[in-house]
Amino acid sequence: FNADGLPDTAVWSYDNGFARNEEAQWYQEGNAYCKDRKLIIEARKEKGRKNPWYEAGSNDWRKKREFVEYTSSCITTSGKKEFLYGRFEVRAKIPVSGGAWPAIWTLGSGMEWPSCGEIDIMEYYRIKGEPHILANAAWGTDRQWSAKWKSKAIPFTHFTDKDPQWADKFHVWRMDWDETAIKLYLDDELLNEIPLSETINGTIGMGTNPFRKPQYLLLNLALGGINGGEIDDKGIPMRYEIDYVRVYQKQ
C-alpha cells in the first residue's frame, strides 16, 4: 500500500454493490485507497443516491432498497492470489463506532459457502449491544448454506480495560495456519485455535477439508446488517486503516 491511489490491481479486486448479510453499505471502488503508505477503507453516508438494482415489490433485500444510504469497500485477492498455509499478518486500526463491522478474513474457491471454508482472522461488531472482537472458522454441514462454526468472541473490554486508548492505536492480527491447525492471534495473544482434524465438510462438501486447500484474502468495512447493529451517523465517515498485509510461507 506504499503508492498513493488505488491498491495494486495485480493483487486486489473489488466487490461491487450490496454483497452480504443485509448490510447497509453499497460496495464500490472509490472508498478504498492508499495514502501515506496505508490502505484506507472509508464508509460514507450518501444523499439521494438511487440503488441501480432497485425493483419495486422485490423480496430480494439487494433490490428492494430504493436508495443507497451508505458506501464502503471490500477488497479481495480472489482470482489473483490464493494461499495454502503460512503466517498471515495484518497491522490495522479498526473503527469501533456504532454499526461498524470491519473484518480480515479468507474464503476458499471452487465450492459454495460454507463448504469452501471461511476463516475470520478479525471481526469487530456488537453482540447484544456490547462490542466484541471475534476470531472464527466455518465449514460445511449436510445442509446448504448452513455452517459449522468454531468461534471465539472476546468482549472489547478485555482489551480496553488494559489500555483505554486501544481503539486509537494500530494492532497486529496474525494467523498461523499449517497442516494441523489454524491459530488466530491479536498482538501475540492467542484468541482461537482450530484443529484441522475437526474441520471436515458434511455431505454437500463431500467430506473434504476446506482448510487443506488454498484460500484468498478479503479486507472490508461493512455497516449494520445482521451483525453490525445500529449505525451511529456521528461516526461517519468511518475509517478502517491498514498499515500492511504480509503472508509468509515455507519454501
Regions found by a protein language model. Give the residues of each.
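GH16 jelly-roll
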Residues: 2-251
